From Swiss-Prot:
HAMAP family hit by this protein: TatC
Chief location category: membrane
UniProt family annotation: Belongs to the TatC family.
Transmembrane parts of this sequence: 27-47, 76-96, 122-142, 161-181, 193-213, 217-237
BP term (GO), one: intracellular protein transmembrane transport
Assembly description: Forms a complex with TatA.
PANTHER family registered for this protein in UniProt: SEC-INDEPENDENT PROTEIN TRANSLOCASE PROTEIN TATC (PTHR30371), SEC-INDEPENDENT PROTEIN TRANSLOCASE PROTEIN TATC, CHLOROPLASTIC-RELATED (PTHR30371:SF0)
Gene Ontology MF terms in the entry: proton motive force dependent protein transmembrane transporter activity
The keyword Ubl conjugation is assigned to this record: no
Localisation: Cell membrane
Superkingdom of origin: Archaea
Protein topology in the membrane: Multi-pass membrane protein
The protein's name: Sec-independent protein translocase protein TatC
């Protein structure tokens, strides 16, 4: 009886095989929908890749291919990103339906509160990367070589840089939420972070190096500046929470 009363409301004891079967069924749904969406997006993927690169890369830069499968891989990546974006509500729904029976009411409330903020921060980070960081990065890095040679970039490598920047900065923008949660959960004190700013900035620079491996160090400095601003915003928020 004690064991039953400790279960979350609405939860039913299931064997490992039943859990795995349910997980398999939900994964099949998500994978099938993702593949169908990729097939639907593929005819438009070349135009989407071109549109994505057109804003991020200066207009005087020539985008070309250096391998037979390069453009095809870029189109597949675009299809996958588009499918995940369009099918994201289904992904969230299936994940929540799988996990919900094992969650207590206060854990569900926590997810309802935190997840929207996390999603908004990720989108904000991606937008900053795409509309601010990437154009600035390409303009400065490519601009230094204009006197020597006309720039021609690989479509595959350039598209990979764009997607890595957008996804990486989206994840980096989770820093304020992580810091606020860590302080609220008592894992770290606000005063400790305030007094150890230099150490925190060093850690943030390490994160910037990881998410934007650029030999010029320019992109790392941009990401570090954004992270420093987010850290200070977090410190202000925790003062009132």
């Amino acid at each position: 009886m004690a064991a039953e009363s400790s279960l979350p409301p609405g939860d039913m004891e299931m064997s490992l095989s039943e859990h795995l079967r349910e997980l398999r069924n939900r994964l099949i749904i998500v994978i099938a929908v993702t593949l169908l969406l990729m097939l639907a997006i593929f005819p438009f993927s070349a135009g989407l890749v071109d549109a994505v690169l057109a804003h991020a890369v200066p207009s005087y830069v020539k985008i070309t291919t250096y391998a037979p499968m390069e453009m095809f891989k870029a189109r597949l990546t675009m299809c996958f990103i588009g499918a995940i974006t369009v099918g994201f509500p289904l992904l969230v729904y299936e994940a929540f339906r799988f996990a919900a029976p094992g969650l207590y009411p206060h854990e569900k409330r926590f997810l309802y509160l935190v997840f929207p903020f996390s999603l908004l921060l990720f989108v904000a980070g991606g937008l900053v990367a795409y509309f601010v960081t990437l154009p600035l990065f390409f303009s400065i890095v490519i601009g230094h070589g204009l006197e020597v040679a006309a720039p021609a970039l690989s479509v595959g490598e350039t598209f990979s840089i764009v997607t890595n920047f957008v996804a990486g900065l989206g994840l980096v923008f989770q820093v304020p939420l992580i810091i606020v949660l860590a302080i609220k959960m008592g894992l770290v004190k606000r005063e400790t972070l305030v007094k150890g700013r230099l150490g925190v900035y060093g850690l943030l620079f390490g994160v910037a190096m990881f998410f934007s491996p650029d030999p010029t160090l320019f992109s790392q400095l941009i990401v570090l500046a954004v992270l420093a601003i987010l850290f200070e915003v977090s410190m202000v928020l925790t003062r009132f929470l």
